[in-house]
Amino acid sequence: MRIEEDLKLGFKDVLIRPKRSTLKSRSEVELERQFTFKHSGLSWSGVPIIAANMDSVGTFSMAEALASFDVLTAVHKHYTLEQWAAFVQRVPASVLRHVMVSTGTSEADFVKMQQILALSPGLKFICIDVANGYSEHFVAFLQKAREACPNHVICAGNVVTGEMVEELILSGADIVKVGIGPGSVCTTRVKTGVGYPQLSAVIECADAAHGLGGQIVSDGGCSVPGDVAKAFGGGADFVMLGGMLAGHDECEGTVVEENGEKFMLFYGMSSESAMKRHVGGVAQYRAAEGKTVKLPLRGEVEFTVRDILGGLRSACTYVGAERLKELTKRTTFIRVAEQENRVFGSN
């Protein structure tokens, strides 16, 4: 046992210090990024925000809606091959280039992933997603996927420390997913005591990844557009959002009614709700590590996305970043004891 004395920070612990800017308008800010990925060699340009691979966020409907904003969607792994085939036939190539195919790490997952990718050459992104990216089995699966899919962009995670980011990149990941426990419906930290404050994880993992020519995605911890800006400011190449995109028409979630008001269920993918739906229940040897919440219906996701992108552009103008790529170079974080005036409530 040992204790690390360094204080680790989450998004709520800091603000971005404003700096002199030559920008006259938020409209001058370029949010599009261009990447050429380490292993696949593929190039991609777009707004580097990703809808999370949760079954009530990363849906086909969400992918179609977000593609119009040049934003990615990690489509959840629970669609059938037949549903994928119908989707691929229905949507244009401009949507498919914004889609990540999510997979677990079982042999059945591997076979299904290959079958989905074979449906269209336009499917170029793979998202290998497990709660604990520190297992040898996960690394072996990543290596197997890289060997089988040399020309696809592979995003793999989740981890929170630099040495594991390096191992995953050296094992074939183009992008490493960073975050353990920060999600809005994740209870891993309280069930297990394991985790890492998200901003510090992003800063440290970005440093490790960029040294090897890889990228990271900050997964979890964002509750307001300002948190998205902080993640990019901390060095994230991509930011994955779950709760901020939940509850919309495109989420295809379960709608319940209470006292005449309608709500949409939103739950973590390690929650009892998710395990009952997809694997028949919580196994006797494990605990649920997610919760279920009821969200008021939020309408079309378009308006939320515009709010997020608008906040991100505004953050760039406050520090003089003409392009999103420049935000991390222009960011100075200050530690704070408060974030906002709550006289009339939060946000």
From Swiss-Prot:
Its EC number is 1.7.1.7. The active site is at 186 (thioimidate intermediate). InterPro entries: Aldolase_TIM, GMP_reductase, GMPR, IMP_DH/GMP_Rdtase_CS, IMP_DH_GMPRt. The keyword Oxidoreductase applies. Coiled coil: none annotated. It catalyses: IMP + NH4(+) + NADP(+) = GMP + NADPH + 2 H(+). GO terms for molecular function: GMP reductase activity; metal ion binding. SMART domains: IMPDH (SM01240). Pfam families: IMPDH. One of its GO terms (biological process) is purine nucleotide metabolic process. It comes from the Bacteria. NADP(+) binds at residues 108-131, 216-239. One of its GO terms (cellular component) is cytosol. Keywords: Metal-binding, NADP, Oxidoreductase, Potassium. K(+) binds at residues 181, 183. HAMAP family: GMP_reduct_type1. Catalyzes the irreversible NADPH-dependent deamination of GMP to IMP. It functions in the conversion of nucleobase, nucleoside and nucleotide derivatives of G to A nucleotides, and in maintaining the intracellular balance of A and G nucleotides. Homotetramer. Belongs to the IMPDH/GMPR family. GuaC type 1 subfamily. This is GMP reductase. It comes from Serratia proteamaculans (strain 568).
